[in-house]
Amino acid sequence: MKKLVLIFIFLISCTSNSSNETIAAPVMELTYQNLDGEFVSEDLTNKETIIVFWADYWGICRQELPVLEANLDNLLKNYDVIALAHSDLDSTNYWVNNNLNGILQIGISTNEIRDEYKVIGQPLTIILNTDGEVIFREYGYIPNKDF
């Protein structure tokens, strides 16, 4: 039974599910734990916001984050961008320090954030409009050309 559950979770996290529907109540502020272990809040009303939910133990996420970081200059013209890890603080810090350039805003997601955005696997990319509404969500790897 455990194997079936693990296989189910794996399959869900590998599928692409793109949708442009607005879901959940608008969120105007995002509070998460930064890599220093402090809780910080981000105002989500300045620009549309891209949030990438990822995990340092998941191979596809480890592939996607450097791609996201490589496209950050272009993305920041129109979006605020944050990547929220579903991993513990120490392992996330270790992976980020050894694999990224330090320009991508990284944090640790909380259960409240994951519930708010109905995160059931990763990677998950969502885009919020300036009213805090989800206007795009896609599970799975997003290739370089699509960022």
Language model: regions and residue ranges:
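Structural microenvironment flanking redox-active thiols in thiol-disulfide oxidoreductases
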Residues: 62-99, 109-115
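Short, small/polar residue-rich loop motifs at catalytic or cofactor-binding pockets
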Residues: 26, 47, 120-122
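N-terminal "domain-start" segment that seeds a small globular fold
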Residues: 15-42
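Sec-dependent signal peptide recognition
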Residues: 1-7
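Non-catalytic, surface beta->alpha helical segment in thiol-disulfide oxidoreductase systems
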Residues: 121-126, 130-147
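Short, internal strand/loop/helix patches
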Residues: 97-131
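Short active-site neighborhood of thiol/selenol oxidoreductases, capturing the structured segment around
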Residues: 40-62
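C-terminal motif of bacterial Sec signal peptides marking the signal peptidase cleavage site
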Residues: 11-13
